[in-house]
């Protein structure tokens, strides 16, 4: 039987124990699906007889306004996990560096591509914070680095100055830096904390998702920000053409 490493497997729990669980593993907003999104999905049912836009043009246009980045720097996917796998398959890293502990999906994706995964263990004496030691662990053999902001499961936020220093180290070593900001919007002043101001670097990829903050894990919608158009093109080609349902690509922007 296939074993899942990600949380939120309520169906598996129900099948095994005959009841629902109080699930603290998925960290999804308890407030439910926003009313505007529910209405947009209902309205979009009228288009269900047509294939969705494979480039998510309408959704990317709204996200571009929300994120204040060019639409061509945005790629939408079937949740952030879809984009993690697409990135790994597109970039084909040989060696990757992760903080430990961190979100298990990074290593799961990397291993499907035959990538060697190195973990830099975070220290309890430092409150499991990412420090300069993690930056120093990036070397010439490192092709990809993942950083979860804030980290899952420790909850620690890496200061933006340290993220910038990590990016510079990755640039010097020829590595891609993947900053996962799927939880960042739960924090006050998330816009100030975001690595978006560093997006001029072609080595930076930022992951975002509607899953957590907007209580729509079952809907599956994520996106990434990156100024490296060639890399985004490879990621687009690394997955199926219609990753985002027609029920979603015209949904309201996060501001709605």
Q: What role is predicted for each listed range?
A:
Residues 1-50:
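N-terminal "arm"/small-domain region of PLP-dependent enzymes with the aminotransferase-like
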Residues 24, 145, 180-182, 207, ...:
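Structural scaffold positions in well-ordered secondary structure
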Residues 52, 64-86:
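Short loop-beta-helix segment that forms the pyridoxal 5′-phosphate
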Residues 89-147:
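PLP-dependent aminotransferase-like
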Residues 128-141, 153-177, 181-213:
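Active-site pre-lysine segment of PLP-dependent enzymes
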Residues 200-233, 246-247:
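Active-site PLP attachment segment
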Residues 235-237:
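Anionic-ligand binding region
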Residues 249-256:
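Conserved small/polar residues in nucleotide/adenosyl-binding loops
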């Amino acid at each position: 039987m296939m074993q899942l490493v990600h949380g939120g497997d309520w169906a598996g729990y129900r099948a095994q124990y005959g009841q629902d669980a109080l699930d603290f593993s998925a960290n999804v907003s308890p407030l439910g699906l926003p009313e505007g999104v529910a209405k947009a999905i209902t309205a979009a049912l009228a288009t269900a007889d047509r294939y969705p836009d494979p480039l998510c043009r309408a959704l990317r246009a709204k996200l571009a306004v929300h994120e204040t980045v060019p639409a061509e720097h945005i790629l939408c996917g079937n949740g952030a996990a879809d984009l993690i796998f697409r990135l790994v398959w597109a970039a084909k890293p040989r060696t990757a560096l992760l903080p430990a502990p961190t979100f298990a999906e990074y290593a799961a994706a990397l291993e499907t591509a035959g990538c060697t995964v190195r973990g830099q263990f975070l220290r309890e004496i430092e409150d499991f914070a990412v420090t300069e030691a993690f930056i120093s662990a990036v070397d010439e053999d490192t092709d990809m680095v993942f950083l979860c902001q804030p980290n899952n499961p420790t909850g620690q936020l890496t200061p933006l100055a340290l993220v910038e220093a990590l990016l510079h180290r990755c640039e010097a070593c020829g590595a891609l830096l993947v900053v996962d900001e799927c939880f960042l919007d739960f924090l006050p002043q998330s816009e100030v904390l975001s690595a978006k101001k560093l997006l001029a670097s072609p080595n930076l990829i930022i992951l975002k998702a509607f899953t957590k903050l907007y209580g729509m894990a079952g809907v599956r919608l994520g996106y990434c920000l990156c100024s490296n158009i060639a890399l985004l093109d490879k990621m687009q080609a690394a997955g199926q053409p219609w990753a985002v349902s027609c029920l979603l690509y015209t949904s309201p922007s996060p501001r709605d």
